[in-house]
């Protein structure tokens, strides 16, 4: 997700927050999700190391890339909330 799209999502969230349609995101919520994402990334890396099929390895690498993207977004959000 590009920076522009991410900024739009933050603006949308802020508008929903002001209108009472969304609850405030707490750093503890983000930290909880971040822990889960890091565990998932570690598990995927371990599975990639043991898989011999090239197709499955490629699919797992795609999942790992998505997990890493989500981790970087969660870290950004945590910095913004601090």
Region spans (language model):
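Amphipathic alpha-helical coiled-coil segments
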Residues: 43-44, 67-82
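Short, charged, amphipathic alpha-helical segments
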Residues: 31-35, 56-66
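Generic structural signal for well-ordered, non-membrane alpha-helices
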Residues: 8-11, 35-46, 69
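Residue-level signal for functionally critical sites in structured catalytic/ligand-binding pockets
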Residues: 5, 33, 41, 61, ...
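Residues at alpha-helix boundaries and short interhelical turns
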Residues: 21-24, 51, 68
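Long, non-catalytic architectural segments outside compact domain cores
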Residues: 1-36, 79-82
């Amino acid at each position: 997700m590009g920076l522009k799209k991410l900024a739009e999502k933050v603006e949308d969230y802020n508008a929903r927050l002001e209108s009472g349609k969304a609850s405030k995101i707490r750093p503890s919520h983000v930290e909880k999700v971040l822990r889960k994402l890091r565990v998932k990334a570690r598990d995927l890396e371990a599975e990639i190391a043991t898989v011999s099929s090239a197709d499955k390895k490629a699919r797992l690498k795609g999942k790992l890339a998505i997990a890493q993207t989500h981790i970087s977004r969660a870290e950004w959000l945590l910095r913004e909330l601090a």
